[in-house]
Structures are given as structure tokens and as C-alpha cells.
């Protein structure tokens, strides 16, 4: 039994030893026979939640007794707590509103390219639903509703940066790739918090459906604080699968202070593009709460983009899209736009830029995209570990 208990994460083992909870939401990693483990859990009184096929993982709510019983199975390699992820932006009241739109004569618009997004959902904002349908698919992992909604607001805001058409601002607050599509997965609740297992499931779903919707970019506008090796290796495995499927994953550097080596979680992986935040009000400087590198020998963030007082789409966070299976329609918004600050804004901007690059050349790889972005950046007058290769020059990027 002692050797078997080594399969338990140390925090989970301690909680079980001290009888802290009646049940434990856990992630179970299997070496093989995932379906057999799923069947075993469903046979009992415990609560099976989901299976993440690409990562050979199962999420479930189990009693301590069930955990100690199931861990004896040789096909199980590890059981750990299901941790949390957190969104990387906050609403701000500001008279200064920064638009991230590109020039009126810009050649590309993201046409034919879909951006997968894991966030708090997407409100059916007119800037996303008129002219062309911006939300190509909506999936609600939190509550299982069929129709788009957003009870936090971040997902709608990020969607607007990527592909809002600016129809209610005469184009002033148009997104970067207004002809692209959004596959929106709601994994975050109204407080901006998500179980990591739900995030894994969302990423796995986007990869599996990427061919059907031509998903070329996955935007993950959130962070995790854990350095748990299993969780990070699972993110890395999913990111590698995305790369092999022709998809680029874009993430924010995070919300820690911009002190040396403050980046945490998957933002430090070399299988994603990590975007730091800039304060562009007055002299451009690193945003105070933009997590910084370096990460060992790896340069992170990869590049930086504006993230302070960004203006994008507002949402009615009280709107619920259905009742008893029937679709409900939202009331007209009093204000179509709002301002937010945070590195998720910077990640959304770069996600939109990646959509434009894929419209230009759909065969580009992860390494191609990263090289093109880095070669088109300009270093700013502060430490490289805060900015990566610097601020992106979009004119230079698309000049060739």
C-alpha cells in the first residue's frame, strides 16, 4: 500500500490522511485502459465528471475510500487535486479608451480562419452577430446551456478584440480580425474561475474539432499559479498536439508584478506564444501587473502588446440565454463598449494578428508564426525580460 500511495499527489495525500473533506475533485492520469477506469468510476456512487482523451485523464469527485481503492489499479499512474485557473483582466473606469483596431486600408481581416477561445462565454453582442456571424460555435462546460451568454464579461471583451466588427462605433472599436470566426467555450464561471480539468477538456475539444471549423489559433486568456509537474506536462502535451494539428496557442504572461522571473504556470512553456502587457498611455512602459521572465534559458514573454484601458465589447452579465430549453433574447445594451486592463487583452490582440497571418498563408507552422512575430518586433527602452522581443510592428509584419 505504501508504494501505491506514491501515486497520490502530496497535497491530496495529506488531505486524505487528515480526513479533511467528504469528497475530492481529482484528476486521474492513466497509463492505459482509460475507458476501463471510467467504467469503474461510473459503476460506483461517485461522480464521474469528464474524460480528456488526448491527455489520458479522467476528472471525478471521489471519496477518500474510492481514491485509495482505485489507485491500486496498475493502469493508474497519478491522482492529483483538480486545481483552478483564473482570468487575466479586470474592468476599469477610464476616460482614456485605447482602440486596438488596425488601419482602414489593411488588406487582411481573418476571413476563413477560426479562433478557439476558452473563457467565460460570449454575449451575443451586435458587433459579433450582425453582418457576419462571429460566434461559429458555443459550448458551455459550466452549466450546459446551448446558446451564447457571458455572466462574467471577459469572454465577450476578448472576442471583441479578436473579431468585433465595430458596427456600433462606426468602426472605432473594431477588432483585429473582424472577418474571423470565434469558437467560444465557456469554462470559467461568473467569478472568472475555472477548474483546470474543464480547461483541459475545452482545449482537447478545440483540437479535435479544428479541421471542421478551421481553428488555427487557440486563445487562452487566463493563468494558473500552480507549478505542479503533472498539470504543466498535461498542458504541454495538449499544446504539442495543437502544434501538430497546425494550431498556434496564445497565452498572456499573467498578472504577477513585472519583477524578474515572476511568470508562472503554462505561460513559461515553449509550446505556446506568451504575450506580455504594455502601458501605452504616454511613454510606453511595461504594465505593472504583467508577469515577467526569464524562465530558465527560455525568453518569456515572447513579445508584448498594449493591455491598459483597452476598449472592447460590453456585455449584459445578468442575461441567461435559455430557460427550460427555450432560447431567450437579450435586452438592448445601454453601453455597447467598456474598458478593461490586463494581459489577456494583449493575448487577444496577438491572437487576432495570428488569424490574419493564417489568412495570408494557411500552411504556416507554430515556428513560422513565432519567427514572423519576433522578427517584426521593436525592443523598447526597458529590460528584455519584461517585454520579450518587444512591441509588434504590424506594418513591418505584413510588408512582405
Placement of each model-derived feature along the sequence:
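Subtilisin-like serine protease catalytic core
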Residues: 105-117, 121-136, 146-196, 213-216, ...
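Substrate-binding/access-modulating region of protease and related hydrolase catalytic domains
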Residues: 188-271, 339-341, 345-347, 385-386
Amino acid at each position: 500500500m505504501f508504494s501505491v500511495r506514491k501515486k497520490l499527489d502530496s497535497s491530496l495525500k495529506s488531505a486524505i490522511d487528515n480526513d479533511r473533506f467528504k469528497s475530492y475533485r481529482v484528476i486521474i492520469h492513466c497509463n492505459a485502459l482509460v475507458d476501463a477506469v471510467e467504467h469503474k468510476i461510473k459503476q460506483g456512487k461517485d461522480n464521474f465528471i469528464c474524460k480528456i482523451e488526448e491527455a489520458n485523464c479522467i476528472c471525478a469527485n471521489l471519496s477518500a475510500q474510492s481514491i485509495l481503492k482505485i489507485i491500486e489499479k496498475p493502469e493508474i499512474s497519478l491522482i492529483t487535486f483538480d486545481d483552478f485557473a483564473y482570468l487575466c483582466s479586470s474592468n476599469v473606469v477610464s476616460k482614456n479608451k485605447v482602440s486596438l483596431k488596425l488601419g482602414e486600408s489593411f488588406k487582411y481581416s481573418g476571413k476563413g480562419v477560426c479562433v478557439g477561445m476558452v473563457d467565460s462565454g460570449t454575449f451575443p453582442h451586435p458587433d459579433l452577430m450582425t453582418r457576419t456571424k462571429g460566434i461559429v460555435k458555443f459550448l458551455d462546460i459550466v452549466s450546459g446551456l446551448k446558446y451564447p451568454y457571458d455572466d462574467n464579461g471577459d469572454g465577450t471583451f476578448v472576442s471583441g478584440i479578436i473579431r468585433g466588427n465595430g458596427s456600433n462605433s462606426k468602426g472605432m472599436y473594431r477588432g483585429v480580425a473582424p472577418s474571423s470566426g470565434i469558437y467560444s467555450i465557456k469554462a470559467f464561471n461568473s467569478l472568472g474561475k475555472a477548474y483546470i480539468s474543464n480547461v483541459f477538456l475545452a482545449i482537447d475539444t478545440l483540437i479535435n474539432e479544428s479541421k471542421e471549423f478551421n481553428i488555427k489559433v487557440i486563445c487562452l486568456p487566463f493563468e494558473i499559479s500552480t507549478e505542479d509537474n503533472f498539470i504543466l506536462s498535461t498542458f504541454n502535451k495538449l499544446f504539442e498536439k495543437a502544434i501538430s494539428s497546425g494550431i498556434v496557442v496564445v497565452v498572456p504572461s499573467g498578472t504577477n508584478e513585472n519583477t524578474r522571473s515572476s511568470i508562472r504556470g503554462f505561460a513559461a512553456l515553449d509550446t505556446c506564444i506568451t504575450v506580455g502587457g504594455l502601458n501605452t498611455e504616454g511613454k510606453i512602459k511595461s504594465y505593472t501587473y504583467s508577469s515577467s521572465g526569464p524562465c530558465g534559458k527560455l525568453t518569456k514573454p515572447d513579445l508584448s502588446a498594449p493591455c491598459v484601458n483597452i476598449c472592447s465589447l460590453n456585455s449584459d452579465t445578468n442575461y441567461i440565454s435559455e430557460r427550460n430549453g427555450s432560447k431567450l433574447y437579450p435586452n438592448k445594451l445601454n453601453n455597447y463598449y467598456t474598458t478593461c486592463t490586463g494581459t489577456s487583452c494583449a493575448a487577444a490582440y496577438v491572437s487576432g494578428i495570428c488569424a490574419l497571418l493564417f489568412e495570408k498563408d494557411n500552411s504556416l507552422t507554430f515556428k513560422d508564426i513565432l519567427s514572423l512575430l519576433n522578427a517584426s518586433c521593436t525592443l523598447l527602452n526597458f529590460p528584455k525580460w519584461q517585454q520579450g522581443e518587444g512591441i509588434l510592428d504590424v506594418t513591418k509584419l505584413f510588408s512582405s
